[in-house]
């Protein structure tokens, strides 16, 4: 691939149930086509949590570079928004080196955040939330109206309205269409074989 074409390099997303062969497929394809793997799993991001997390083996990492592993300690906060930010930078980095990025998982929210370009709002402010929770639903609607905050679809649910306020009105966070230049491969396996 020419370096001027790296933005045209697709993101290959491989999804499927546990033990369906996602990782082995990704490794084989990445070896053949010159790719690197970003693990989209909410457990593998944690350091020192190697048991029960299906982290790639040392041998797998030697065959193909893997990213998204051992990013934070278990006592540290790590959100889907942070995963999205990390992954987008990593995808850009992989493409800039004329490699193909593979996003493999795992955790649906992590995958969807990239594929559907989720817009994450601000982190919740405990003091502000406490004040908002004391208001009636009608007072929350009035607050939204005065502050040009579009009400969520479920505007009768106080919790949804409060979260919408915290996010500054970003409540339609999921696009219906997949982002451009993404190829999604879904693996299905007979339940008896799992």
Task: Locate predicted features.
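Phosphate/pyrophosphate-binding catalytic cores of soluble transferases and nucleic-acid-acting enzymes
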Residues: 1-194
């Amino acid at each position: 691939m020419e370096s001027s074409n790296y933005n045209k390099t697709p993101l290959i997303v491989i999804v499927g149930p546990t033990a369906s062969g996602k990782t082995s497929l990704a490794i084989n394809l990445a070896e053949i086509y010159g790719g690197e793997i970003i693990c989209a799993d909410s457990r593998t991001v944690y350091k020192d949590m190697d048991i029960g997390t299906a982290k790639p083996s040392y041998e797998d990492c030697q065959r193909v570079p893997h990213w998204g592993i051992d990013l934070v300690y278990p006592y540290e906060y790590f959100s889907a928004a942070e995963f999205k930010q990390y992954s987008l930078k990593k995808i850009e980095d992989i493409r800039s080196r004329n490699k193909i990025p593979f996003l493999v998982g795992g955790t649906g929210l992590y995958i969807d955040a990239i594929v559907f370009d989720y817009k994450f709002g601000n982190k919740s402010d405990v003091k502000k939330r406490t004040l908002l929770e004391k208001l009636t639903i009608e007072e929350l609607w009035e607050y939204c109206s005065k502050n040009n905050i579009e009400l969520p679809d479920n505007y009768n649910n106080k919790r949804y309205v409060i979260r919408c306020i915290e996010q500054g009105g970003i409540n339609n966070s999921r696009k219906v269409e997949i982002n451009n230049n993404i190829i999604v491969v879904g693996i299905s396996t007979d339940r008896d074989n799992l």
